[in-house]
A protein has these predicted regions:
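FAD-dependent oxidoreductase catalytic-site/capping-region signature
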Residues: 17-168
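Acidic/histidine-rich catalytic neighborhood
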Residues: 1-16
Length: 168
């Protein structure tokens, strides 16, 4: 298999990390985000407004012990999609004249109506990519958002429930 599943066993992960640290080789010597893409939510846009990262592993993967029973989730892959320039705006406010006091932060994620539509277009673009014949051998059931979520409203609910910021 070509995923990271086998490396999610603690003894194998430790061996791979040691090999990477000592020799600079092996599966842990490179970052596992295999592919990145810039996409347009609308073909009429001049520039891409979405970014995606592909990982050859399940988003639900967890490190497991060698003597534990196998991970039923097994092999898989996933991709995330992010809006590069959202219209939504949050705010950071001072809560006190004390410079050490924590500020009040409101993210304001997905408050601009166009942002959710942009992310929805990104989810649909990833579905289209993963529906291509080269993925036939590896494709299983879609776990997120799930094949049962097809309408705009269903996808919007899923996006609101799972979206997070990755930019730093």
């Amino acid at each position: 298999p070509v995923t990271l599943h086998n490396l999610m066993r603690a003894d194998r992960a430790a061996k791979a990390l040691a090999e990477a640290a000592v020799f600079g080789t092996g599966p842990a010597a490179r970052f596992p985000l295999e592919v990145g893409a810039f996409l347009k939510s609308d073909p009429g846009r001049d520039l891409p407004d979405l970014q995606s990262h592909f990982l050859p592993g399940r988003s639900t993967a967890a490190l497991r012990l060698p003597f534990a029973r196998g991970d039923a989730r097994g092999h898989g892959y996933f991709a995330n999609v992010y809006q590069m320039r959202p219209d939504s705006r949050g705010e950071i406010r001072l809560t006190s004249p004390d410079p050490y006091a924590a500020p009040a932060i409101r993210g304001g994620y997905l408050t601009a109506p166009g942002d959710i539509a942009t992310l929805r277009a990104g989810v649909r673009a990833l579905r289209e990519i993963f529906a291509q014949p080269p993925f036939d051998r590896w494709r299983g059931a879609e776990t997120g958002p799930g094949a049962d979520r097809q309408s705009d409203a269903e996808l919007d609910d899923w996006i609101r429930a799972t979206a997070e910021s990755v930019y730093h």
